[in-house]
Amino acid sequence: MGELFRSEEMTLAQLFLQSEAAYCCVSELGELGKVQFRDLNPDVNVFQRKFVNEVRRCEEMDRKLRFVEKEIRKANIPIMDTGENPEVPFPRDMIDLEANFEKIENELKEINTNQEALKRNFLELTELKFILRKTQQFFDEMADPDLLEESSSLLEPSEMGRGTPLRLGFVAGVINRERIPTFERMLWRVCRGNVFLRQAEIENPLEDPVTGDYVHKSVFIIFFQGDQLKNRVKKICEGFRASLYPCPETPQERKEMASGVNTRIDDLQMVLNQTEDHRQRVLQAAAKNIRVWFIKVRKMKAIYHTLNLCNIDVTQKCLIAEVWCPVTDLDSIQFALRRGTEHSGSTVPSILNRMQTNQTPPTYNKTNKFTYGFQNIVDAYGIGTYREINPAPYTIITFPFLFAVMFGDFGHGILMTLFAVWMVLRESRILSQKNENEMFSTVFSGRYIILLMGVFSMYTGLIYNDCFSKSLNIFGSSWSVRPMFTYNWTEETLRGNPVLQLNPALPGVFGGPYPFGIDPIWNIATNKLTFLNSFKMKMSVILGIIHMLFGVSLSLFNHIYFKKPLNIYFGFIPEIIFMTSLFGYLVILIFYKWTAYDAHTSENAPSLLIHFINMFLFSYPESGYSMLYSGQKGIQCFLVVVALLCVPWMLLFKPLVLRRQYLRRKHLGTLNFGGIRVGNGPTEEDAEIIQHDQLSTHSEDADEPSEDEVFDFGDTMVHQAIHTIEYCLGCISNTASYLRLWALSLAHAQLSEVLWTMVIHIGLSVKSLAGGLVLFFFFTAFATLTVAILLIMEGLSAFLHALRLHWVEFQNKFYSGTGFKFLPFSFEHIREGKFEE
């Protein structure tokens, strides 16, 4: 089979890179993205590797760039992204980059510090301006006799009796508006009502110099008598984080201070504007290049991380690396190494040497933007074992088709297809926007899956003749009512029977099968569900058994490729016979009944369920039991016996043959050391047995070929028993599992019909002049519920059930999924802006 149906052939290669050329060679390999480096220093601490200092320098540059990016985003300056892929800087360029980033960071920090100090000063002056303005209003109000009478409680009765002049102290300040009620209660309780508080709101919010948020504040002035109350008031103000400001006692002094404050505010505003302009210029200049800087720094960091995976030659002049790479890309890798050597100016070429190993290579399946989503569906279950059959090419068709069987509705399929087509046509623009919405990104990555699901849903919707729960009368119904009146229907028959059944046996009633799909007359029939359930149930069984048989057939190609004849003789053959003897025969019975009994003889059609149950019970009653065909009893008994014989065939033969092979090897005293045979030479049959065992052994961790392990017949027998039981019971449970195709299709059709009947049908029934307006609102509700329930919820449900059918019922027949993914060293994720390591 071609590479499309299997993972790429991989090889382990050793790279010898000259120290001065290693950086450029790894850079070229990163641009190519076809090699996966192995860590040759697993026992060496990360902080003790050779290039750890360079990695730290790159991380420090990355930190500075993140700081600059944060400031750019805070200033709402758009970051320019031209899609440019800059070349990796040379190691000597790191000093210039560090100096440039250091300069920008220090300049921004200095600007921010100065700006924060200026804003703090500006805030204080602004608060003082409002204090002077509001306190003047307070003092003007103090001349009011009513207010003076209100504040008279601040004086002791003895002082009032002696006529002591009123000498009140006061403090003025600003506090957050939401703290005023609590602040007022605290003053009243602590000072026992011996203070007088006046407060007024500042109309405009003030900017916090630290956070940049706008805060609503209020001006307050507190009158008191005595130093003790003064200390209490100041402590309370300090606890509530109120800002206190000096306020002159005379109106003239307050007026002069206000004039000076306004002048200073104007001067400070001018300086702040100039500072902000300078900051904007610095950030705008950085915004033009920051994406390029990010890519350069992170490419350098990735290169040094990769170089830390290499071994250093004892001469300190050569780096040794081991990489996994596809065999088909060896030439391009060699070319990349030559290009890297030329860029570095080295005269000694880098060497790539293929290595022989018994380690299991990583699994690498080439994909494009169309197959990427389907490959992800397979990989979500498990990464395929190296070189085993890849289910993704078949999933491209089977997955959307099984989804459509459950989702089949022509109208809903059109909506889904239109949405997918919109994403496909605008994919370039959407990719360039780099949408960070995770849910939309997930849906967009599966746009081609959704496209095929929509197209197949349109196809199955036409088969079901279902469009928003209504049938399409394209070719005209094949059923006619007129012949029924010709034979036995009368006016009295119509009046006395609310439900009448057409007799297809009468000439002219049934004109033959509908040209395509289901006859639209069934949409208004009262026994519609009975007919559709029978059809969809049988269809689900047929599709399920064909799907599983296809999966078992694919296992044959795996056994042939891995040269495992025992798995063919004692695995594939009995498995395929077991399934076809029982469930393949059931499919044949379904098709036979469809062809043997037409509309005229349907009354005599026997029940397949009864026949299939009696087949296992060997029960064939003499009376009241009609055979489907002659010789049915003998054929069915033979098939059941064959299926039963397949169970010990799968269970016993393979362990016994493996035990016999082990005893023969042990008797011959033959060992194999790297291909050199010692002892009595085995026969040709024994050589094939040894080869089969070696090819069946895959070790991911062992660096050297392992010796023949001791054969444990008990473990082998238990493992084979588990596999046999799982397969035999799985054939039954998996076949039943495919009935979800029928169940989900029924649920979708019923929900669609309920929506039409309970929503849009009511809107269409309004006959008044306001019917158009009513229909508008009902249609809006119908469209919303259709998208939310039938397209999204039901679509997601059908999607998950299709996943289950592929992962469990299909892939477990041939797909082990125990491999590990090929993760090449590549700069692609850096170019796309995905910087997470």
From Swiss-Prot:
Q: Which residues lie on this side of the membrane: Cytoplasmic?
A: 1-388, 427-441, 555-572, 659-724, 810-837
Residues that the record marks as modified (Phosphothreonine) are T250, T360
Lipid bilayer topology: Multi-pass membrane protein
UniProt topological domain (Vacuolar) ranges: 408-409, 472-534, 594-638, 750-770
Q: What is the effect of changing R495W?
A: In NEDEBA; uncertain significance
Instruction: Tell me the impact of changing N527D.
Output: In NEDEBA; uncertain significance; impaired acidification of endolysosomal compartments
Query: Tell me, how does this one assemble?
Result: V-ATPase is a heteromultimeric enzyme made up of two complexes: the ATP-hydrolytic V1 complex and the proton translocation V0 complex. The V1 complex consists of three catalytic AB heterodimers that form a heterohexamer, three peripheral stalks each consisting of EG heterodimers, one central rotor including subunits D and F, and the regulatory subunits C and H. The proton translocation complex V0 consists of the proton transport subunit a, a ring of proteolipid subunits c9c'', rotary subunit d, subunits e and f, and the accessory subunits ATP6AP1/Ac45 and ATP6AP2/PRR. Interacts with SPAAR.
* Protein name as catalogued: V-type proton ATPase 116 kDa subunit a 1
Give me the gene this protein comes from.
Answer: ATP6V0A1
